[in-house]
């Protein structure tokens, strides 16, 4: 039988290991640590009996309590939907204008609308409705198809030049490609671009801008208005933007204006009624209207 070695100074047995003259003492674990360890073992055994614990092929031990986090989640989701149901039903039965007048419905629609917007609209229009090139800003007061709550609701519901019988605009038809279709020559396009720049006090060629006014009156005023205030200002629903506000969907520099006049533009927005229910669309309309630019 091997002789147990003890440390001469402390009198404690060593483990027999030695590193560079250092020996490891074989002190027992503290009692408080052992007690906690034993309690943990006991608790784990109780847990195994009461709660789901061990996998069994495609199943698992259910435990005496029959607890399931999945079932708890399903129940909580169901409870949440039930709590929302009365508001969703009320919103579906209320016009978008009247939702704005009801404090409780407005608060619910704004909260839901923000979530729906981030999920469905922010990818194009930005998280704050700030827009991007080719996608209009929704947080200002410049609207191509109307900025009332009813207008916004209709736009979201039926889309712009979308595959929907009540879509706004006409599918496949947008701004005329004046250069590509041979309606205006290069000089005329440059002149009308200078005229538009002059309306925004940015023209560098007064003579070309003066000639451009004639070209504009003959070719552009029918949609954009004589004073370039946009189609809504002249009572038309064609989505022609105002050209005097400094808000540009594709860019307001001369090169971009020339490109736009030459090739035309025909923005498209999907009809969300094919994906979202009416209460969701109304909540979105209310939320967008309250981003800051609603009429």
Curated annotation (Swiss-Prot):
Gene Ontology molecular function, alphabetical: electron transfer activity; heme binding; iron ion binding; oxidoreductase activity
Co-factor requirement: heme c
Topological domains annotated Cytoplasmic: 1-31
UniProt keyword Heme, yes or no: yes
Mode of membrane association: Single-pass membrane protein
UniProt KW Coiled coil keyword: no
Top-level taxon of the source organism: Bacteria
One Gene Ontology biological process: oxidative phosphorylation
InterPro entries on file: CcoP_N, CcoP_N_sf, Cyt_c-like_dom, Cyt_c-like_dom_sf, Cyt_C_IC, Cyt_c_oxidase_cbb3_su3, Cytochrome_c_Oxidase_Subunit
Domain Cytochrome c: residue ranges: 108-200, 207-292
Membrane-crossing segments per the record: 32-52
GO cellular component: plasma membrane
Subcellular location: Cell inner membrane
Periplasmic side: 53-295
Keywords noted in UniProt: Cell inner membrane, Cell membrane, Electron transport, Heme, Hydrogen ion transport, Ion transport, Iron, Membrane, Metal-binding, Oxidoreductase, Repeat, Respiratory chain, Transmembrane, Transmembrane helix, Transport
Binding site for heme c 2: 175, 220, 223-224
Binding note for cofactor: Binds 2 heme C groups per subunit.
Pathway: Energy metabolism; oxidative phosphorylation
One of the Pfam families matching this protein, by short name: FixP_N
UniProt binding sites for heme c 1: 121, 124-125, 269
NCBIfam families associated with the record: ccoP
Similarity field: Belongs to the CcoP / FixP family.
Function: C-type cytochrome. Part of the cbb3-type cytochrome c oxidase complex. CcoP subunit is required for transferring electrons from donor cytochrome c via its heme groups to CcoO subunit. From there, electrons are shuttled to the catalytic binuclear center of CcoN subunit where oxygen reduction takes place. The complex also functions as a proton pump.
Subunit relationships: Component of the cbb3-type cytochrome c oxidase at least composed of CcoN, CcoO, CcoQ and CcoP.
Protein name, entry field: Cbb3-type cytochrome c oxidase subunit CcoP
Native organism: Azospirillum brasilense
